[in-house]
Every structure is written in C-alpha cells, then in structure tokens.
C-alpha cells in the first residue's frame, strides 16, 4: 500500500482557515493557531447574533409603531389589542413600514383599532371577576 503524505491536505485546511481570518488584526490573520481560535470564536458570535438580530429588529419595529400610535392618541399595547379585536392581522414589520411611508393608511388602521376598542367597551359583557371579588 502506498504511503500517504498529508502535506497537501494540511496546507489546504490551513489556507481555508487563514482565508476566513482575512481582515483580522495582528497575528490572528497569519498564524494558524491563533487564526483558528479567532475564526471559531467569530463563528460563535455570528451564530449568536443571527438570533439577536431578530430580537433587535422586532424591538425597533415596536418602538416605531409606538411612536406613530402615540401621535394618534393611543398606546402600543392598546393599538395591538384593538387590531386583534378588529380582526386585522398585520405583522409588526409591515405596521412599522406603513407608519413610516404611508401615514394616512396608518391613521386609518389606528381609527379602526380605536373603533374596535370602543365597540367592545360599550357592549355589556359580564366581567368574569365581578362575582369572585367582594
């Protein structure tokens, strides 16, 4: 059986790691041991931050919606509750985009949410806690 020399494989693996470490500072970009550790850590950060990006964008959309809704005299929580009661299913990303680019359409959504909240307030639905608390 022929002898297998691993120089080509090792060189290819090292080259792959060093290519991923391009742009790093100091010895992390050209020393295989430090580059490998830095690349591993960067992949961990990338994995974690792909999850965090979703949270960050949702928080941004909520802040934008809240700011736009407060101009209309409502809070974010009441607005979302009103939309649910009105049967309007629009996600927060689209609501945020509508609030920024189409204020008239957003005002109509706020009006329908207010109307749904007022309608439910005026109906005589028995409170579940009335009999329990004395």
UniProtKB/Swiss-Prot annotation:
The keyword Ribonucleoprotein applies. HAMAP family: Ribosomal_bL20. GO terms for molecular function: rRNA binding; structural constituent of ribosome. Binds directly to 23S ribosomal RNA and is necessary for the in vitro assembly process of the 50S ribosomal subunit. It is not involved in the protein synthesizing functions of that subunit. InterPro entries: Ribosomal_bL20, RIBOSOMAL_L20_CS, Ribosomal_protein_bL20_C. GO terms for biological process: ribosomal large subunit assembly; translation. Belongs to the bacterial ribosomal protein bL20 family. CDD domains: Ribosomal_L20. Keywords: Ribonucleoprotein, Ribosomal protein, RNA-binding, rRNA-binding. The gene is rplT. The lineage of its organism: Bacteria, Pseudomonadati, Pseudomonadota, Alphaproteobacteria, Hyphomicrobiales. This is Large ribosomal subunit protein bL20. PROSITE patterns: RIBOSOMAL_L20. It comes from Brucella canis (strain ATCC 23365 / NCTC 10854 / RM-666). GO terms for cellular component: ribonucleoprotein complex; ribosome. It holds the Pfam family Ribosomal_L20.
